[in-house]
Amino acid sequence: MDPPAADVDAPFTTGAPFTESAIDLTGDGIPETILREDETLRVLQGDVEIWRSDPAWRVVDAALGDPNDDGRYEILAALWKPDEGGALGSHPFIIGHRGGTVKVIWGGSAVTYGIHEIALADVDVDSVEELLVLESAQPSDGLDAAQRTLSVWDWHGWGFNLRWRSEPGRYRDLGSTEDGIIVATVGK
């Protein structure tokens, strides 16, 4: 059941899209720096860039964790990329370190609802991270806020299964507190 819609001022959240953080992708005990700048995702080891997203992608958000429950840290990227006809589609991609290099290890098909914001959290306290997605119509169509939904997904071996989706217009922001607690802001 969804909570009643209400305007909530939540200044303690950081609901802006991902910009920078660090996580140990390579498993060597030294975290790599992950940057999102101008819709481009970059991975740095020290000052050396070891991976950059495809120039055709528009990376709108990212989350760091273990989205596919394989015991290794990865980057979950929310991105728009052109299909063969040039139309942009919204996709979730997992980027990880495999075989000595950082690369896309899973690329999801275009989704029906455009991905606006993402987070990884263990919402059901089973020691496995779920994917939280604030979805919307493509921002350029002007209907974004009224169509936002919050959905929860879990990994099933080679993709995500939808576990729950709110009614449209109930949620407006995903963020986190300074302690890393995920907060979904209610309201239009």
Specify the residue positions occupied by each region the protein language model found.
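Beta-propeller-forming repeat regions
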Residues: 1-188
